[in-house]
């Protein structure tokens, strides 16, 4: 039986990066879905995007909790009973008394009023409440879709993994908070970075599932595929690096750009022994690494956008430029609350754009990946969209 011919390539106008509907796509895997599952796709996609939006909001609230030094105001982890905030004056005094026992109060906030305590308490409570709400917002629709047969086996497995990651994130959040309740006045930068990075991973994983509901994506097999994947991984790595900057309060120092206090490569990058600890415990090194990785991502995104000539690559480049600008602005202004939150939210937007770019690349037919991204020795023909 003769092989099925590949789809015809569209005309030049349709292949223009900013015109037309773009290149031919790999057919949607409708053969793996029944009629009920096909009909449910818009609702499943909307649900996943809604959960991703909630996670975005939670990351912003988490950033505000950190920047207002509110994260240690609730000294217990009660997944069920802790859902209710203090409702009476006696309950508030009881919560305040627990806070006054920890080092942060005794060494930093000695003499804090009950009103000031309520301010930081509400930030932390809101952050935890959002976590519980997101758990319900994910689980209840998931249970409904599963019970009605609206998800195939692959989606059931993926959603189960996502739900498990959400539970792990809650436990990791408490593990982070617990590090600041004894013998120190802040949380471990290692645990903070892990908590932030896992939030980004869950956010990205949900978007990745939502992006690919209807289409078979190829496995990465070319230079273009690998570069798009590398960009997405670099963004996740940058989020982790940003977590160390936040955990070490590294953004509060060296508030100059493009130099760091007059030096391109500042002295003191390896002040701690052994050298590798500087990556995670030296505020100067953490900020330098965060800057350097930002430059790498910017150059890589610009090169990819030039070679690819696609909408997705252009959007990625623009989000990277915006995020880099926000980062510089935040640094120069010594991390005001609103700018710090914009920069933290911008990181997730860059991740969303990087994953969309990767998704679009893996939806192109292999025969279209013959551009500069695939091999510098070939002709400069480019893949589109």
Task: Spell out what each predicted region is.
Residues 1-25:
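Short, low-complexity intrinsically disordered segments enriched in small and basic residues
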Residues 27-385:
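Polytopic transmembrane helical bundles with strong interfacial aromatic enrichment
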